[in-house]
């Protein structure tokens, strides 16, 4: 429901900001009146004084940017958006929904959790306007992740690209290396760098209870490039077994890099050092030219030290992880969030409608650090080269986008046996044994 009282929050790391201002768009105009600056929000008027609660896992700097992105909307419509970001998001959301006190809106980082809430009957289907906006401004690949059992529930929100390889343009220029456009070229480049006495790759997969997740991304990326999107989709749905020969072949292909002592682990040690290196530190030896390449998502940009120039002519940049089989197209592995509603109050509908438009996405782009796959957005507003590269790939009509597979699987596998299995694999356990163990963990 739309909250009009004081919402008590306990046991959370939370950011709560009410963004509706009593003064509206100007000193002489009450909230909800259309002035020159408020004309773009005319379609969302009629809800003055309403409060809409929004719950998310997004905290810190990005949370501040999101709240700033809809300030003008709140000023002009009189709708207060109470933002709460939590580091214990999934557990708390399940508890709140179970207790009958869900937030009005939730930003879901995992389609699997979204689907669970929809199947419980807790989520409301998306409004007609949100569905229209999504059909117009996002690809069908993106819409399908907000759709559960044929019914559309949640519009795409923000996005990131996982199919990136970080490198040093300065090192490449000084050594005469060129960015590879195919997998074979990338392997040939790796051999050339290894022959020079430098380990071409560096990696780290340690991440507390989530240790191992970076290898799941490697496997997913390679599977898309070898077996294709159709097999990938069936694998996620367990219509293709975890120990299927195609999955084994993809993981062995990953091993040609991550388990190759000639290739890894630049700046850290041998193959097994990968499991003892934090994912945040995994690519840092590139800065000292102790390794040349690091496969990691676009969000790794935030891990580089202050003062590092991230650009094609800078200290650090990224290139698209190249294809293996040209018949499989141009696959992109990525992730993102989806905005779902637990309330069908009109003010909630107004907020979800606005947050599914290019106009809102453009306001986020102006603040920097957040990317969207919205095809109607103005990418010239993006603040950094890596954001522009990411958005360009996400909105490329020739790209086949697929969501992070582990986020789509049952939690017992996707955030459990899959992570653990990849860690065991890095530490020397054979591919068949690892994949068979994960397969046996899939819930009935």
Give, region by region, the residue ranges found by the protein language model.
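Periplasmic solute-binding protein
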Residues: 117-121, 142-179, 184-187, 205-235, ...
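Extracytoplasmic/periplasmic substrate-recognition and gating elements
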Residues: 293-299, 305-371
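Extracytoplasmic ligand-binding clamshell segments of periplasmic binding protein
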Residues: 207, 229-307
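Conserved C-terminal helix/tail region of periplasmic/extracytoplasmic solute-binding proteins
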Residues: 173, 395-444
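Hinge/lid segment of periplasmic solute-binding proteins
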Residues: 37-46, 111-163, 193, 214
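Short, solvent-exposed loop/beta-turn-alpha elements that line the ligand-binding surface or hinge
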Residues: 44-46, 127-139, 205-209, 224-249, ...
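Extracytoplasmic "Venus flytrap"/periplasmic binding protein-like
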Residues: 72-140, 144, 170-181, 284-285, ...
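Long, aromatic- and glycine/proline-rich binding clefts that accommodate carbohydrate-like moieties
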Residues: 143, 365-417
């Amino acid at each position: 429901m739309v909250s009009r009282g004081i919402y008590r929050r306990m046991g959370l790391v939370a950011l709560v900001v009410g963004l509706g201002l009593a003064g509206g768009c100007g000193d002489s105009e009450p909230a909800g009146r259309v002035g020159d600056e408020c004309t773009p929000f005319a379609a969302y008027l009629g809800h003055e004084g309403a409060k809409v609660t929004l719950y998310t896992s997004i905290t810190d700097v990005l949370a501040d940017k999101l709240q700033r992105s809809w300030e003008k909307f709140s000023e002009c419509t009189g709708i207060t958006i109470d933002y709460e970001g939590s580091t214990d998001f999934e557990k708390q959301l399940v508890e709140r929904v179970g207790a009958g006190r869900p937030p009005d809106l939730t930003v879901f980082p995992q389609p699997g959790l979204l689907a669970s809430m929809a199947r419980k009957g807790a989520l409301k289907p998306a409004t007609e306007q949100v569905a229209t906006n999504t059909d117009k401004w996002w690809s069908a690949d993106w819409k399908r992740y907000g759709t559960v059992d044929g019914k559309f529930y949640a519009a795409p929100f923000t996005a990131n690209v996982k199919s990136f390889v970080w490198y040093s343009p300065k090192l490449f220029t000084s050594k005469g290396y060129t960015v590879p456009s195919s997998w074979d070229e990338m392997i040939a480049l790796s051999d050339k760098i290894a022959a020079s006495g430098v380990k071409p790759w560096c990696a780290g997969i340690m991440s507390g209870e989530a240790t191992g997740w970076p290898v799941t991304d490697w496997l997913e990326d390679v599977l898309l490039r070898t077996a294709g999107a159709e097999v990938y989709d069936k694998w996620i749905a367990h219509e293709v077994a975890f120990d299927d020969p195609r999955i084994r072949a993809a993981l062995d292909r990953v091993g040609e890099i991550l388990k190759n002592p000639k290739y890894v682990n630049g700046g850290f040690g041998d193959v097994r050092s990968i499991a003892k290196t934090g994912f945040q530190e995994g690519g840092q030896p590139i800065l000292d030219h102790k390794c040349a390449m690091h496969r990691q998502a676009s969000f790794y940009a935030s891990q580089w030290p202050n003062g590092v120039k991230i650009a094609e002519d800078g200290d650090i940049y990224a290139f698209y992880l190249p294809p293996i089989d040209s018949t499989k197209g141009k696959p992109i592995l990525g992730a993102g969030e989806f905005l779902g509603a637990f309330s069908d109050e009109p003010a909630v509908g107004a907020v979800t409608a606005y947050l599914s438009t290019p106009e809102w996405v453009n306001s986020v782009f102006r603040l920097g650090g957040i990317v969207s796959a919205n095809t109607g957005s103005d990418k010239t507003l993006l603040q950094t080269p890596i954001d522009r590269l990411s958005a360009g790939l996400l909105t490329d009509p020739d790209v086949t986008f697929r969501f992070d597979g582990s986020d789509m699987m049952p939690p017992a596998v996707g955030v459990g046996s899959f992570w653990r299995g990849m860690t065991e694999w890095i530490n020397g356990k054979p591919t068949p044994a690892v994949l068979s163990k994960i397969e046996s963990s899939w819930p009935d």
